């Protein structure tokens, strides 16, 4: 099967605003390079003004009547937008859900290790999913699991708050804890 290269690139490319001669309207509301309103002018006049200032005429709002166009350096504005998107992406933190698994018979030493890991996850700003798995006859003693999750909740009170209270899903008791907001 042959796939044309142009078709794949078109899907990835963002829709571009019409510029210069590609603007189809006869009249446009023109905004100057410095942001001032010039008014409603013919497309030929707008192109002439853009050409005199050695900039591009870019259609900002095609929905308006007449369409709004601005005199600007199109390449520079695209570059600035890409830079802003990259900066926003860089500053964005991906919140993950980390999971710690307990058992009804989890001993004190193991409990403390798992609790330390939960504290670390919440301090890093990640949500924590605490699951407690019952095997075999342990299902008859679900109250022990509930007590263990209540203890975890009490121990993590200063680091986070319960987002999803303990509930049974099959043979597991699951609780989700969200980190406290930083001031």
From Swiss-Prot:
HAMAP family attached to this UniProt entry: IF_3
Function: IF-3 binds to the 30S ribosomal subunit and shifts the equilibrium between 70S ribosomes and their 50S and 30S subunits in favor of the free subunits, thus enhancing the availability of 30S subunits on which protein synthesis initiation begins.
Main location: cytoplasm
Family from the record: Belongs to the IF-3 family.
Subunit comment: Monomer.
Keyword Protein biosynthesis: yes
A GO molecular-function descriptor: ribosome binding
SUPFAM superfamilies given in the database record: Translation initiation factor IF3, C-terminal domain, Translation initiation factor IF3, N-terminal domain
A single GO cellular-component term on record: cytosol
Keyword presence, Acyltransferase: no
Matching Gene3D superfamilies: Translation initiation factor 3 (IF-3), C-terminal domain, Translation initiation factor 3 (IF-3), N-terminal domain
Annotated organism of origin: Pseudomonas fluorescens (strain SBW25)
Recorded superkingdom: Bacteria
UniProt keyword list: Cytoplasm, Initiation factor, Protein biosynthesis
Protein name: Translation initiation factor IF-3
Subcellular location: Cytoplasm
């Amino acid at each position: 099967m042959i796939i044309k290269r142009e078709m794949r690139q078109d899907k990835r490319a963002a829709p571009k605003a019409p510029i210069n001669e590609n603007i189809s309207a006869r009249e446009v509301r023109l905004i100057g390079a410095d942001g001032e309103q010039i008014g409603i002018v013919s497309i030929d006049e707008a192109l002439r003004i853009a050409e005199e200032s050695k900039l591009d005429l870019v259609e900002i709002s095609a929905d308006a009547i007449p369409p709004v166009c601005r005199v600007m350096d199109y390449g520079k504005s695209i570059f600035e937008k890409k830079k802003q998107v990259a900066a926003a992406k860089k500053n964005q933190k991906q919140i993950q859900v980390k999971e710690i698994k307990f058992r009804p018979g989890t001993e004190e030493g193991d409990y403390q290790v798992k609790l330390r890991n939960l504290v670390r996850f919440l301090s890093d700003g990640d949500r924590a999913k605490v699951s407690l798995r019952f095997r075999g006859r342990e299902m008859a003693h679900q109250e022990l699991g509930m007590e263990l999750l209540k203890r975890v909740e009490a121990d993590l009170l200063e680091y986070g708050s319960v987002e999803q209270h303990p509930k049974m899903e099959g043979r597991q008791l699951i609780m989700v804890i969200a980190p406290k907001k930083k001031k």
